[in-house]
């Protein structure tokens, strides 16, 4: 009995193994049809490293639209507050007046269009564009910018400290917006890769098209004072960015103070750049 069961088991096992390895056959009107039972090999999915090494076609001129920078705005304060110029612009001021709320002082740049022109083997490129640079400096103290100072004074005061009894501030910021044109040399260390390693450095020229002092207080509510507040209409800055795959970091540092007189505040920005092209390429993949 045991031998019979063992023999039956071996026969059944051999039949199953043979059925797996032997193709199915079917005879119809004398025609033999054979079906292969071998498993179908599927093409492996592209991994992360393989997608990084994917090559792209190279063009002498590449254009990008609608890039957005999101980051921080601030300035280096080199003002001599005891001097005549600072006291004429902001009477009674000191180094504490213009202290900013660091993480609430924000920079947003909207790059309408940027282009890159191949100079040497797509490794060295000329990079340029056109965009809007929006800077917001949030102050800790209730400083107020006067949009219409007295005209009968040669250098009228512009900034004062609000000491109204019982008034509290929810927001107090100076906004300075520029039309900006950057011009940079771009070094692309992986020009034929979809996710590159790039470094760019150069200068930008900005023109002030709008400025305002926005406040929200307990008794006045929301107020906007629009004026140039004797800000320098031109802003020249050192600019640069670093791209690692889909991540781009940017930064800028102005040549000089953003004020024509009184205050020596040299602005700088830094943050991360968002590319719509990277977003849409992820959706398509």
Predicted regions and their residues:
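Sec-dependent signal peptide cleavage junction
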Residues: 17-62, 280-285
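Residues on the lipid-exposed face of transmembrane beta-strands in outer-membrane beta-barrel proteins
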Residues: 56, 68, 110-116, 130-132, ...
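Outer-envelope beta-barrel architecture signal
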Residues: 60-66, 122-128, 175-179, 193-199, ...
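Extracellular/periplasm-exposed beta-strand and loop segments of Gram-negative cell-envelope proteins
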Residues: 79-85, 93-104, 137-176, 208-218, ...
